[in-house]
Every structure is written in C-alpha cells, then in structure tokens.
C-alpha cells in the first residue's frame, strides 16, 4: 500500500511539476532562512555560558549620558576592591583590560588577544595554571607573560613554550613566556591568547579598566543590582553613581561596548529571524493554496476511490504522503542552500562552531518546521476528506466565499512582499542619506589618514604624499575625527550663568587648529578658531556643548575644570559634527591648540602623530597600494597604519548594511514566491476554466475581456495587500528611523514605485498564461472536455 501511495504521489508531483518545483524551492529558502536565523540567535545568546557559575559573574559599568549605549566602557582601578569591601554579596572582584595586540615570533608578526589582569581575576574567573610559574602576575613585571595551550600550539607546535621569548611591537625589550594557562572556549567575549599583568593606578579620577565581580551563591541578584545602582561613591571632588551590573552572559547583546559590538546587532538578528519565519509561512501558504486547488480538481478522483472502498484513513495517508515527499525535497534543497552560504554566513555571524554542528542544528530546526507544516495542512486535508460523495460529484456550488482561502493566501503573500520591499527601500534610502548628507557637519569624502606612534617620520611621509598625483591635500600632525587617537575628556561643574538645575558637563577635547577645521570643511559659526597664538586656555566649542551650558551668547564665557578649577574661555563656536555612530546625537566637543591635564597628573597628552590627506576621486586603490609599498620598503619596523575615513565611518553602519542585504534577499524571495504562486494559480485556474473561457469567446468575448477577468481579481488583491502593508511598514520604519539623529524622509514616490513595480511583475506573470488560454480554439476545447 505504501508503494502505491508513493507512486500516486510522485505521479501527481510530476503532473504539476511547475507548481511542485516552485513550492519546493520556496520552502527550501524558507527552511534555510529560518534555520540559520534561529541558530544565529541561539549562538548570540549563549556567549560565555560555559563558565562555572556564569550566572553570578557581572560586568560593572557606569551610566554615561552621551555614549553610544548609555554606559561608560571603563571604570577606575580602585572600584573592584571597593565593591569587594563594601558589598557582602560580592565574592570576588577584579580589574582587567582586553584588547588585540601585535607580537613578533621568529620575525613573523601575529595578532593575539591579550587579557591584562590583576591577581584577583582568579577569584572571579576559572583560569588555571598548567605549566610554569605565576611570575607574570608580579606588579610592574612587564617582561613576563602567560599564554594558553592553544596559543602555544599555534606559536611553537609541540615544543614547551616556557622560557621562550616573543617581541611586542610596542616595546623594545623581549618578553619571556613563564607560564601556560588554560584557555576558554572561542564562544566568549574574552577569548584570550595571552595574559599579562595590568598596571595599577590608584586614582578615582582615571578610568581605564573593566571591572568584573562574582556574587556569592546566596546573593539576591536583582536586589544587589538595584542596591549597586542606588549606591553613591564620593572621593574628594569625585562623585560616582548609577553603576549598572550586566551579566557576563548578556554582554554580547545587552548594551555592549560600541567598539566590541557584533557584526550584526541582536535586534537586527531578531528581525531577520522574524523575516525568515514570514518567508517560510509564505512558502507554506503558497504550497497549501496550490495543494487545496489540486484537491478540488481531483475531487472526482477522490470520490471514485471512496466508491471503490477507500477508507478515510487511506485517503488521508495518500494526500499526506504527497505533501510529505514535497517537504522532504524542500528540506534537502534547504540544506543545500545552507551548504552554499555557510562560509559567508559563518563570517557574518562570527560563528565559532563546526560545520557539522551547524548542519545538525539546522536539520533540527527544519524538522520542527516540517512538523508545523504537516499540522497546518492537516485541517484542509481532513476537511476535503470528510466531504460527502454527493457534494464532491455535484457541480452546483454557492458562489459566495468561493476560493476564499486562495484569495487570503495570495493577499497575505503580497502583503509580506510589499512590506519587505518597502522596509528594505526605506533602509537603503536612510543609509544613502547618512553617507551623502551635508548635515554631518564635516566632509569625510575621499579622506584618509596615516597613523603612527611617533612623529619621527611625519615630515618624510608628508612629502611623499604631496608628491603623489593621486593626493589633493595633505594635513600633517592632525588627529582623525572618525576613530580618533587620543582625545580626552574635560569635566566641569562650574560655568558662567549656570542654571540651578543644570547637570555636570563633559567635553571631548581635540588638540587642533584652523588648518584642521579647513581640512574637514567644518563650519565656524561665530568667533575664531584657536591657533598657535591663542591664549593657553582658549577653547572653541560645538553647538552641543553650548547647548549643554545653556548659553545663547557663548563668546567670552568661561568654565572651570572639575578636578583642579583651571578656567577656560570660549573664543568660537563650530557647527555640530557627527563623527560617531549615527544613532548618537552630537555630543559636547571642543578644540584647543594644546591641552594639559594638570593637577596631580604627570603625563602630557598628544594626538599629533598622524597625517590626514584627501585623495582624488576613484584613486583610492592605487593610492593605498603606493603608500603601503612605500611604508613596507622604507619603514618595515615602524608601527604605521593607513586608515580610510569613509570606510571607518561605514563600520558604524555595518549591522544595518548586513540587515539590508538580508532583508533585500528575503524581499526578493517573497516577491518571487508571490509571483510564482499567482502564476501557478492562474495556470491551474485556466486549466480548470477552459470550457468557461471557450464559451465566453463563442458569445463574443475577446482576449482583452478575458484578461480583464483575471487582472481585475489580482489587482483587487494587490490593493488590499497594499492597504495593510504600507501603513504597517511605515509604522515600523518610522520607529526604526527614530534611532538616528539624521533621518531621511519617507517620500510619497516610494509607495508609487513599489506598487507600480509589483503590479507590472504580476501583470507579466499572468498575462502570458491567460493570453495563451484565451487564444485556444473553442471547438478544440469543447471536444477535449
């Protein structure tokens, strides 16, 4: 019996091969999208869950207005010990720094993830000494390090690394490996290769560390986080409050540090998952609509099977076998799509898992979808199975509600397609606006920078750049605005005309002059720019800083630095510029010719070790190649890097760009599904209504009249879908645009273009099939019937 079911199922799939192929490919895309998106979300939400007591480890950050995520990324060194002494819930607390470093081993330069810790880190994290000594933890011992087993294997193979030396590109003396320690899973935010001792600076006014704590097993986590948030630390003139405790396992997605965000933000991955679910739902409805239409066309066949003794169970098994075969083929093609996109997807999602794991997870998700699809299809199959023999054979049917499911299904698919296209179009328009708007307050088009750690080679490299025909303008000894090197914060609590309810103001300071403003083509609104002849504490503010102070006439106004009372005088105001992530409003910033920290701080801040230049349109590849060749030839041992400012700014939008590509692909898939569904339905309907079309032609109807019957129906469905899709899409995208300080407009022409484009595609998809049916000879049709 099973063999018979399989033969009948295969025969019907081949009979409607076009519809079957469309359904298989549609569901295969849906399977692949949903499986990969679900795997992606699970991967993002399980970072660092492998730690012993991972749910008790927290990262401590301070609320910071104006930062990209509302939190400061660094804390003072004394904070860890203070939390351990003050809160009984804290079992251990430590300071660490995590960054990528460059080391040379046998003349080869390698990038290693460096974890710089204090000795208290062993009370918070599971770091085990496997070989060697703990000399790397001795304070101010910068010539000893520990490496992981994985790193040791990578650098030295099977040889013991103890006693071997490596060379940091940032210091002259070699570094000795004194220990081998355990490594963590790569599925971690702190996936280290090398461990060093962090430096100590017992001053509450300097923040440069990450503070982590481990709570006791009995601690009330919610109560502690609220108590910590309400706690105020006062050390002299320094007041610290509103500390936020973020679980280690949530650091990947819960307001991560801006420079450590994933390639695609979790909220965008979630949107992709929802979109993938909609795609697979469209694909299922697409096939279910075709399947129901085929069941109707096979009504007499099913009735004859019933007359000849087929039971309800056998009819259900017959139909579900056909459906199951199609789902299995869709699953196989879906796995094939996953295999094709796996390398690209692994890089985009930053997966640290094997290919076999992805296949196993994807297969599990696809299996769940297959179960859902069978349950979804069971109702219509049971419904038609239970129809009486008389109603199946009878040709008299009530016109009202006829083909309602088909119309609802097509409308839903069109609605999803229009929504995807509209959202992707608005997103594309917004990203174009951010790259090309004049409201950035600066011109970064065709701008690049050569960055280095000293001024030794600045003049020689500047002369080389000036000699290049590809370079239009050179500005040495300036700091890049995007991804700056060395900007500092100036805090103030005291200024002229301060309102009683005003909050403290923090200003980002840039050591720059007139040539910098001219290079970036920034706008000086009033006053003058600082120069070498300016007074020591003259400062130029941006509009955001003036607004924070509450001034209407800022020129000549003064304010005092918090930690030492040093006064500063405003001599100019520049237009706001957006050099950070576009989701962040312009922050208070200022320009000084020179800025010294003063007070008890002994170091001098400099940001002059860079060269800015502007290259000619379309010459970046050539320009980059020439500069890199020169640097490798003339300065092979110097840390000199080339940075394209436009590319660095584009990294702020990397998540949005990835989401745009994903949504664009899904929009294309959904549109094709809808169009193919309409084409398949029209093909089936034309075959079902051949006799009706022939009779209409005999009674005087021409091809245009017959085309109008079908066009009118699908035009109505398209309009209904648009009435729902456009308002929903507008509401979603308007909310999404609120994340950006510079927003594009949702133009009226966008609606017209999308509607007209989809209408044309639908017209082309149904036009040929209806035209072919309308041009058949009525006599031949009647004879065949």
Residue positions per predicted region:
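Mid-to-C-terminal secondary-structure elements
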Residues: 118-133, 145-264, 463-651
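C-terminal transmembrane helical bundles of large multi-pass transporters
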Residues: 637-718, 722-723, 733
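Hydrophobic alpha-helical transmembrane segments of multi-pass inner-membrane transport and secretion
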Residues: 15-42, 264-300, 327-328, 405-430, ...
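Intracellular coupling helices
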Residues: 6-14, 18, 22, 26, ...
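Generic structural signal for small/hydrophobic residues in well-ordered secondary structure
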Residues: 13, 23, 44, 60, ...
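Membrane-proximal extracellular/periplasmic loop immediately following the first transmembrane helix
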Residues: 37-102, 108, 207-214, 223-227, ...
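Small-residue-rich transmembrane alpha-helices
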Residues: 32, 36, 244, 323-389, ...
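Membrane-helix entry/capping segments
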Residues: 3-6, 11, 15, 19, ...
């Amino acid at each position: 019996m099973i063999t018979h079911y399989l033969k009948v199922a295969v025969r019907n799939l081949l009979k409607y091969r076009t519809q079957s192929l469309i359904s298989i490919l549609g569901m295969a895309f849906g399977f692949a999208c949903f499986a990969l998106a679900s795997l992606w979300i699970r991967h993002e939400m399980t970072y660092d869950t492998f730690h012993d007591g991972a749910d008790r480890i927290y990262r401590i950050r301070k609320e910071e207005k104006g930062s990209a995520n509302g939190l400061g990324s660094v804390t003072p060194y004394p904070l860890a010990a203070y939390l351990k002494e003050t809160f009984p819930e804290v079992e251990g607390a430590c300071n660490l720094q995590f960054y990528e470093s460059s080391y040379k081993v046998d003349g080869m330069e390698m990038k290693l993830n460096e974890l710089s810790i204090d000795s208290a880190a062993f009370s918070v994290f599971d770091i085990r000494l496997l070989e060697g000594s703990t000399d790397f933890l001795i304070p101010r011992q910068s010539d000893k390090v520990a490496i992981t087993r994985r790193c040791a294997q990578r650098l030295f193979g099977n040889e013991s690394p103890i006693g071997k030396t490596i060379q940091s590109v940032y210091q002259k003396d070699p570094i000795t490996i004194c220990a081998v320690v355990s490594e963590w899973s790569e599925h971690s935010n702190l996936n280290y290769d090398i461990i060093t001792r962090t430096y100590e600076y017992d001053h509450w006014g300097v923040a440069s560390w990450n503070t982590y704590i481990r709570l006791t097993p009995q601690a009330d986590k919610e109560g502690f986080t609220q108590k910590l948030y309400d706690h105020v630390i006062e050390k002299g003139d320094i007041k610290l409050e509103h500390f936020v405790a973020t679980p280690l396992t949530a650091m990947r997605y819960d307001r991560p540090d801006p420079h450590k965000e994933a390639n695609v933000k979790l909220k965008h991955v979630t949107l992709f998952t929802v979109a993938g679910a909609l795609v697979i739902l469209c694909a299922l409805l697409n096939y279910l609509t075709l399947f129901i239409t085929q069941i109707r066309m096979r009504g007499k066949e099913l009735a004859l099977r019933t007359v000849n003794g087929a039971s309800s169970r056998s009819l259900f098994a017959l139909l579900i076998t056909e459906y199951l075969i199609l789902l299995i083929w869709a699953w196989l093609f879906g796995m094939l799509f996953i295999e094709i996109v796996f390398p690209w997807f692994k890089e985009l999602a930053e997966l640290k898992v094997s290919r076999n794991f992805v296949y196993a997870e994807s297969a599990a998700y696809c299996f769940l979808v297959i179960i859902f699809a069978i349950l979804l299809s069971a109702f219509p199959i049971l419904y038609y199975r239970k129809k009486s023999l008389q109603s199946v054979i009878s040709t008299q049917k009530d016109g009202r509600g006829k083909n309602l499911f088909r119309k609802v299904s097509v409308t839903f698919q069109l609605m999803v397609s229009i929504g995807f296209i509209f959202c992707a179009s608005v997103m594309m328009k917004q990203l174009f606006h951010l790259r090309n708007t004049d409201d950035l307050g600066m011109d970064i088009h065709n701008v690049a920078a050569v960055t280095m750690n000293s001024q030794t080679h600045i003049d020689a490299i500047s002369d080389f750049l000036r000699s290049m025909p590809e370079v239009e303008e050179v500005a040495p000894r300036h700091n890049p605005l995007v991804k700056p090197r060395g900007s500092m914060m100036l805090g103030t609590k005291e200024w002229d005309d301060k309102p009683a309810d005003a909050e403290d103001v923090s200003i980002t300071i840039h050591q720059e002059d007139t040539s910098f403003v001219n290079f970036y083509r920034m706008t000086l609104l009033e006053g003058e720019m600082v120069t070498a002849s300016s007074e020591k504490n003259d400062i130029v503010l941006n509009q955001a800083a003036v607004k924070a102070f509450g001034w209407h006439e800022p020129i000549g106004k003064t304010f005092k630095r918090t930690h030492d009372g040093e006064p500063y005088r405003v001599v100019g105001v520049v237009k706001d510029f957006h050099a950070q992530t576009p989701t962040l409003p312009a922050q208070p910033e200022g320009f000084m010719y020179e800025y010294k920290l003063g007070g008890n701080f002994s170091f001098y801040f400099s940001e002059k070790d860079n060269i800015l230049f502007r290259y000619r349109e379309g010459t970046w590849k050539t320009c980059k190649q020439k500069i890199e060749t020169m640097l490798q030839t003339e300065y092979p041992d110097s840390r000199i890097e080339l940075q394209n400012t436009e590319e660095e700014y584009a990294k702020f939008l990397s998540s949005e760009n990835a989401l745009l590509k994903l949504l664009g692909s899904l929009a294309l898939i959904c549109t094709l599904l809808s169009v193919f569904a309409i084409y398949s339905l029209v093909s089936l309907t034309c075959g079902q209504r051949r006799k009706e079309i022939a009779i209409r032609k005999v009674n005087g109807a021409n091809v245009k009249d017959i085309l109008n019957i079908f066009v009118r129906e699908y035009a109505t469905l398209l309009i209904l879908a648009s009435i729902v899709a456009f308002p929903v899409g507008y509401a979603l995208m308007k909310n999404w645009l609120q994340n950006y300080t510079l927003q594009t407009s949702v133009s009226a022409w966008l609606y017209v273009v999308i509607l007209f484009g989809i209408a044309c595609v639908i017209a082309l998809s149904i036009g040929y099939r209806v035209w072919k049916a309308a041009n058949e000879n009525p006599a031949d049709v009647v004879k065949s019937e």
